């Protein structure tokens, strides 16, 4: 584990734009149960691809007109209980950090793994996210056709 003082700026990059920090398993479960619409779950990390790609991509994507109903973050390697619980919702995917999952009614509908993040630029991650926002977070997201 890293000293918390080192993590504050990494946490604040996301909380500053309105992403809620969840540090316990109960807080993660409460967010999943308490969200109508799409919940974006960000697994934050100290690694370079989180710092140089994922967090900047998320910040830029949050300028998009369509966004998740709610967004939360856990910090891998620091908030173990919360991270494990969040990953428990990422059915069918191995643990990876950083990563971003999209849940509707507690079910995973879209996943962006570390392998998707580390091979892209922040601009490309922004594009991935805005596409996911449009597909899973818009007014017609989840509508049966």
Swiss-Prot record:
Gene3D superfamilies, per database record: Glutaredoxin (3.40.30.10)
Highest taxon in the source lineage: Bacteria
Any one biological process term the GO annotation gives: cell redox homeostasis
Entry-linked InterPro entries: BrxB/BrxA
Cited NCBIfam families: YphP_YqiW (TIGR04191)
Sequence similarity: Belongs to the bacilliredoxin family.
Protein's recorded name: Bacilliredoxin Acid345_1880
Organism for this UniProt entry: Koribacter versatilis (strain Ellin345)
Lineage, opening ranks: Bacteria, Pseudomonadati, Acidobacteriota, Terriglobia, Terriglobales
């Amino acid at each position: 584990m890293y000293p918390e003082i080192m993590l504050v700026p990494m946490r604040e990059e996301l909380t500053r734009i309105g992403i809620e920090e969840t540090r316990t398993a109960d807080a993660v479960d409460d967010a999943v149960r308490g969200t109508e619409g799409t919940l974006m779950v960000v697994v934050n990390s100290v690694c370079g691809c989180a710092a140089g790609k994922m967090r900047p991509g998320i910040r830029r994507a949050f300028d998009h007109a369509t966004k998740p109903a709610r967004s939360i973050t856990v910090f891998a390697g620091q908030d173990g209980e919360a991270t494990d619980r969040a990953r428990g919702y990422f059915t069918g995917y191995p643990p990876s950090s950083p990563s971003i999952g999209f849940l509707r009614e507690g079910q995973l509908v879209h996943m962006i793994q570390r392998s998707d993040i580390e091979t892209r630029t922040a601009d490309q991650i922004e594009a991935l996210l805005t596409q996911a926002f449009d597909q899973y977070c818009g007014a017609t997201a989840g509508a049966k056709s």
